[in-house]
Every structure is written in C-alpha cells, then in structure tokens.
Amino acid sequence: MEKTPVKIIAKNKKAFFNYTVEEKIECGLVLKGTEVKSLREGRISFPDAFAEIKDNEVWVKNFHISEYIYSSVFNHDPERPKKLLLKKDEIKRLKRKVEEKGYTLVPLEFYFKNGIVKVLLGVCKGKKTFDKRADIKDRDIKRDMQREIKIRGK
C-alpha cells in the first residue's frame, strides 16, 4: 500500500527568521468543509499566527483562511480560531514548555497528508536583533562559497 506524498499548502518563512525553532510537532486541525476547499486552493495567510493553550486545548489564532468563492450562504468565518488535535500528554508537555520564559507556539507550515490537513507546530524562542544579523551574515557567506565553487567548477 503506497502512501501519498505530502502536499505543502503554505510555509511560514517569517517564523524561521524571527524565531529559533526548538522542537517541531505534527498535529491535526479542526476545520469546516469550505475551509478545506479553500486550503486546497492555497488561500491561506498566517505570518503573525500563534497557538495558545486554553483549558487543555490548543488553539491557533491570528491567521486567515479566505472564504471559498464557490460557496453561497454556508461559508465560514475567515478569522475564527481553529482547534488543534493533539494527545493529552503532548498538550501537557507543550504547556510546561510554553510556561518557560520566552517560548511560544508558532505554526510553521500547513500541508495535506493522505488527504488530511496537518499543521507543523514549532516550539520557538524569539531571536534578538543580533541573532538575526548573525544568521544573515552566515547565509551570505554560504552563498559566496557556493558561488566560488560553481565558478571554479567551470
């Protein structure tokens, strides 16, 4: 039995620049039908999205799934918070981690896995300005090295 490949809907590139990702967790997402159809078209925006734990449930907030254009009256609210599906022990572990100073839960990417929408949730710590500068400098050095290797190879 072959598994279908993962189809990435969207990645949060801004999260990798603003945060250091300590841990990644795959979790499900509670959605309505029109939200899934809209996601299949890639109509999602989540640069400032975050997750919070409330009453032993994890909720993703501050992200937008556009309304499904072919739907009529039964469309969804684009800004509503969505519940994440995790096991109780995972939620407890995340709660302990988030209660530490400086940690937050950030959705890193949304994707379809076997036809089901999944979220890659990251336990992240915010970067300081000098950390961001160091990352940019390292990236530039790598790019220059790759360029030199390419030129010498010709």
UniProtKB/Swiss-Prot annotation:
Entry's Gene Ontology BP terms: trans-translation
CDD domains linked: SmpB
Keywords: Cytoplasm, RNA-binding
GO cellular component terms, semicolon-separated: cytosol
One GO molecular-function entry: RNA binding
Keyword Cytoplasm among record annotations: yes
Record-linked InterPro entries: SmpB, SsrA-bd_prot, SsrA-bd_prot_CS
Keyword match RNA-binding: yes
SUPFAM superfamilies: Small protein B (SmpB) (SSF74982)
Primary subcellular site in the record, as a coarse category: cytoplasm
Subcellular location: Cytoplasm
Pfam families: SmpB
PANTHER family with a match to the protein in the record: SSRA-BINDING PROTEIN, TMRNA-BINDING COMPONENT OF TRANS-TRANSLATION TAGGING COMPLEX
Function: Required for rescue of stalled ribosomes mediated by trans-translation. Binds to transfer-messenger RNA (tmRNA), required for stable association of tmRNA with ribosomes. tmRNA and SmpB together mimic tRNA shape, replacing the anticodon stem-loop with SmpB. tmRNA is encoded by the ssrA gene; the 2 termini fold to resemble tRNA(Ala) and it encodes a 'tag peptide', a short internal open reading frame. During trans-translation Ala-aminoacylated tmRNA acts like a tRNA, entering the A-site of stalled ribosomes, displacing the stalled mRNA.
Family label: Belongs to the SmpB family.
Protein name: SsrA-binding protein
Organism, scientific name: Treponema denticola (strain ATCC 35405 / DSM 14222 / CIP 103919 / JCM 8153 / KCTC 15104)
